[in-house]
Curated annotation (Swiss-Prot):
Pfam families: FAD_binding_4, MurB_C. InterPro entries: FAD-bd_PCMH, FAD-bd_PCMH-like_sf, FAD-bd_PCMH_sub1, FAD-bd_PCMH_sub2, MurB, MurB_C, MurB_C_sf, Oxid_FAD_bind_N. It is found in: Cytoplasm. The gene is murB. It catalyses: UDP-N-acetyl-alpha-D-muramate + NADP(+) = UDP-N-acetyl-3-O-(1-carboxyvinyl)-alpha-D-glucosamine + NADPH + H(+). Pathway: Cell wall biogenesis; peptidoglycan biosynthesis. Its EC number is 1.3.1.98. The keyword Flavoprotein applies. It comes from Bordetella bronchiseptica (strain ATCC BAA-588 / NCTC 13252 / RB50). This is UDP-N-acetylenolpyruvoylglucosamine reductase.
């Protein structure tokens, strides 16, 4: 793989002193979890110290906003939360703005800053929970736009190699809710900052009917602000606030199937919801599959399925990782038995050791 090493900056190494930390408030599912060794990364100069510290532990768990993880009751290892701050415009040309955000920035806050400054192109991704640094790992996407569509490059710390590395789209190997980072040893990389190429002139992406209805209520040509407001309104209406009901957003990926499989399923289930993809495959609506299996609003122990969005698993109070995963497994089994399709979880399931 071709990656460019960023020249080392001459700066003092900031020390890291691990401390015990309750992680219940550090994951949006609100799962009870304890880290005997926890550090917060607030400046890039701390990364060499992390490389020196990590080998002393069984595993290194890198956390962002905790919105896409299932944490165990106790983590045997070092937990490092990325809190690196900063947003700046680093360049512009005739066809794009190039904007850089540090990995610890809140994703929705960053999108809002872009819309406020006229750096349009990320508005379809508004209100997705988490941090900027976690966004490329998952290749987040919503309402017809994926992070990969707006990606320029990123800088990541190679924990074992002890160096900063610059990576472009080819090196990141983006796919549907997937990237190079999801196939590496956990804790091998810490993303430091991400740069985005935001198109000029801007064109709205209104592929979803809900978005079309919300963004053009007045009949005028939609603006980026109107699309942003519409996305926020739709998400708030459909998805629970993690501050009120513990959840990790969409828990399952929408499965991809070939045209033949989709046609066979349509013959048996005429109401099947699917979306054509550029490669000829079809993306099935996982929420529809789960709903049709009767799971919407149901509960299994302390874990449940949200009553308005079947893709969202929620903590009904006191749930632990095993409760969430037992519910997920039951849903997967029912969907596979009925439709012959295996649902894949989106969140990273962190092992206890």
């Amino acid at each position: 793989m071709s990656m460019s090493t960023v020249p080392a900056r001459i700066e003092p190494v900031a020390p890291l002193a691990p401390q015990a930390q309750d992680l219940r408030c550090f994951n949006t599912l609100g799962l009870a979890s304890h880290a005997p060794a926890f550090v917060a990364l607030t400046e890039p100069s701390q990364l060499p110290a992390l490389s020196a510290l990590a080998p002393r532990f069984r595993q290194l768990v890198v956390l962002g906003g905790g919105s896409n993880v299932v944490l165990p009751a106790s983590i045997d290892g070092l937990v490092a939360q990325v809190r690196l701050p900063g947003v700046r415009l680093v360049g512009q040309c005739a066809d794009a703005w190039v904007v850089e955000a540090a990995a610890g920035e809140n994703w929705h806050g960053f999108v809002t800053v872009c819309v406020d400054n006229g750096w349009d192109g990320l508005e379809n991704l508004a209100l997705i929970p988490g941090t900027v640094g976690a966004a490329p790992v998952q290749n987040i996407g919503a309402y017809g736009v994926e992070l990969a569509d707006r990606f320029h490059s990123l800088t990541a710390w190679d924990v074992k190699g002890g160096r900063w590395v610059e990576m472009g789209a080819a090196e990141c190997r983006f796919a549907y809710r997937d990237s190079f980072f999801k196939h590496q040893e956990p804790g091998a990389w810490v993303i430091g900052s991400v740069r985005f190429a935001l198109p000029r002139p801007w064109q709205p992406v209104l592929d979803y009917p809900d978005l079309q209805r919300h963004a053009a209520l007045d009949g005028a040509a939609p603006t980026a602000r109107a699309v942003y407001d519409a996305v926020c309104a739709i998400r708030r209406a459909k998805l629970p606030d993690p501050a009120v009901v513990g959840n990790a957003g969409s828990f399952f990926k929408n499965p991809l199937v070939d045209a033949g499989t989709r046609q066979a399923l349509l013959g048996r289930f005429p109401g099947l919801v699917s979306y054509p993809q550029p490669d000829g495959r079809y993306k099935l609506a996982a929420g529809w599959l789960i709903d049709q299996c009767g799971w919407k609003g149901r509960q299994l122990g302390a874990a449940g399925v949200h009553d308005r969005q079947a893709l969202v698993l929620v903590n009904r109070g006191g749930a632990q990782a095993h409760d969430i995963m037992a519910l997920a497994a039951a849903i997967q089994g029912d969907v596979e038995r009925r439709y012959g399709v295996r649902l894949e979880p989106e969140p990273v399931v962190v092992p206890a050791r």
